[in-house]
């Protein structure tokens, strides 16, 4: 049995439970988005640079997805192809923008875009989509950003706890 793997499993398991408790108490933390960010923290290296990259690139992706909903709702540039055209434009901008060092992890930026789009599209009756353009904590992009930050921090904490447990 690998001692480090056991320690990480224990750490992530316990903190995962705490993460769910937090999500039930603070409704703007979306636990599944937090877990995506948590996993990306480790995929990006599991260190302070990964924490920074996970947060900045993930939120960048969330903002671009929010921009998709705002633009596609306000400006119809393609009739029945309006949505696909705006997806093409915003995803192009998303990937092109990963040349900027703080957004340079394209997979994390894409995940930020995807969780935002998924959250908005799959909300009951599309209830989140009209809220995209609001300046409030109820804006789905804000909730996703909060969740990315919290999930990334849980990733960092679980790594530190695992290291402390395994010695």
List each language-model region with its residue ranges.
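Membrane-interface helix termini and inter-helical loops of multi-pass transporters
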Residues: 74-77, 124-138
């Amino acid at each position: 049995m690998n001692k480090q793997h056991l320690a990480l499993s224990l750490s992530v398991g316990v903190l995962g439970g705490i993460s769910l408790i937090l999500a039930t108490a603070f409704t703007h933390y979306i636990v599944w988005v937090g877990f995506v960010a948590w996993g990306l923290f480790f995929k990006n290296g599991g260190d302070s640079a990964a924490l920074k990259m996970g947060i900045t690139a993930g939120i960048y992706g969330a903002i671009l997805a929010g921009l998709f909903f705002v633009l596609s709702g306000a400006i119809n540039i393609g009739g029945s192809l309006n949505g696909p055209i705006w997806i093409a434009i915003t995803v192009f901008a998303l990937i092109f923008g990963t040349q900027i060092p703080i957004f340079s992890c394209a997979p994390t930026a894409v995940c930020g875009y995807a969780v935002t789009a998924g959250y908005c599209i799959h909300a009951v009756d599309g209830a989140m989509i009209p809220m995209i353009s609001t300046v409030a904590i109820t804006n789905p992009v804000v909730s996703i950003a909060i969740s990315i930050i919290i999930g990334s921090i849980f990733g960092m904490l679980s790594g530190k706890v695992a290291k402390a447990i395994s010695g």
